[in-house]
Amino acid sequence: MDPTLKQLARSLREAPVVDRDGYEYFVHGVTDGVPPLDPAVLEAIADGIRERIDLEGVDTLVAPEAMGIHHGTALSLATRIPLVVVRKRSYGFPEEVAVHQETSYGESDLYLNGVDAGDRVVVVDDVLSSGGTIEAVCEALEAVGAEIVDIVTVLRRVDADHGDISRPVTSLLDVRVRDGALEVVE
């Protein structure tokens, strides 16, 4: 395992798992903002992303609200690449693109602003589960004519059906829920 991610892996092993209408959902600072996320772990996440993807020539980082925001922000601060947040509410701007997302545990609309045709973007999110959020964000980006350079998540649930995503995704760590506990898969 990458030494920069060992602290993240240790903290994940402590994450409680809750049942959310039949979906086993783990609760961690990376994915939920609680418990508090150690700044050293957040910095290690940004470093891990920088080590795994080519950010040369990227114009914009794109992070879905809500839990992609802090990972996108940390990466933006580390790279000086601007960040756009795909919001869960509309501002009604003329160039706004609305898309519908369906995830393992719900559905909603997302709204993209601030990305233009020809922009080279990297999508940053917390976890790949069904892929519904990432696929919706990518559809919005393609609708405005952006070039998706890479998609990166901090975590990938290997026990989930990624059937909603049709694109390659880079992840820092693989995890699964087994017997009511979160495991890091090495």
Swiss-Prot record:
One of its GO terms (molecular function) is transferase activity. Coiled coil: none annotated. The keyword Ribosomal protein does not apply. One of its GO terms (biological process) is purine ribonucleoside salvage. It is an enzyme of class 2 (transferase). InterPro entries: HGPRTase-like, PRibTrfase_dom, PRTase-like, Pur/Pyrimidine_PRTase. It holds the Pfam family Pribosyltran. CDD domains: PRTases_typeI (cd06223). May catalyze a purine salvage reaction, the substrate is unknown. This is HGPRTase-like protein 3. It comes from Haloterrigena turkmenica (strain ATCC 51198 / DSM 5511 / JCM 9101 / NCIMB 13204 / VKM B-1734 / 4k).
